[in-house]
Amino acid sequence: MSNRRSRQSSSAPRISDNQMIDLVSKLRQILPEIGQRRRSDKASASKVLQETCNYIRNLNREVDNLSERLSQLLESVDEDSPEAAVIRSLLM
């Protein structure tokens, strides 16, 4: 079992500490909750990753909700109308 684990980890590309720091720094810049903080109030890498996961989950929920609303809207318009074509394109 340890051989399998070592083979799996050796086949995955390794991320250097500098790359990790750079990636976390980029996440800090793009996450709304973190970007609003003062410079002196920097979040830890762990906190940044946790907030990133939460943000992605929230975005997925929003996409699901919007898709549901578009589906309901599509049911209420004539299926041959230009509006229906636009709605269908948004759902794809």
From Swiss-Prot:
One of its GO terms (molecular function) is protein dimerization activity. GO terms for cellular component: nucleus. Expressed in roots, leaves, stems and flowers. It comes from the Eukaryota. InterPro entries: bHLH_dom (IPR011598), HLH_DNA-bd_sf (IPR036638), PRE (IPR044293). One of its GO terms (biological process) is gibberellic acid mediated signaling pathway. Its main location: nucleus. CDD domains: bHLH_AtPRE_like. The keyword Nucleus applies. Induction: By gibberellin and epibrassinolide. Keywords: Brassinosteroid signaling pathway, Gibberellin signaling pathway, Growth regulation, Nucleus, Transcription, Transcription regulation. Residues 4-59 form the bHLH domain. It is found in: Nucleus. Interacts with IBH1 and HFR1. Gain-of-function mutants (T-DNA tagging) show long hypocotyls, pale green and slightly narrow leaves, elongated petioles and early flowering. They are not sensitive to the gibberellin inhibitor paclobutrazol during seed germination. Atypical and probable non DNA-binding bHLH transcription factor that integrates multiple signaling pathways to regulate cell elongation and plant development. Binds IBH1, forming a pair of antagonistic bHLH transcription factors that function downstream of BZR1 to mediate brassinosteroid regulation of cell elongation. Regulates light responses by binding and inhibiting the activity of the bHLH transcription factor HFR1, a critical regulator of light signaling and shade avoidance. May have a regulatory role in various aspects of gibberellin-dependent growth and development. This is Transcription factor PRE1. The gene is PRE1.
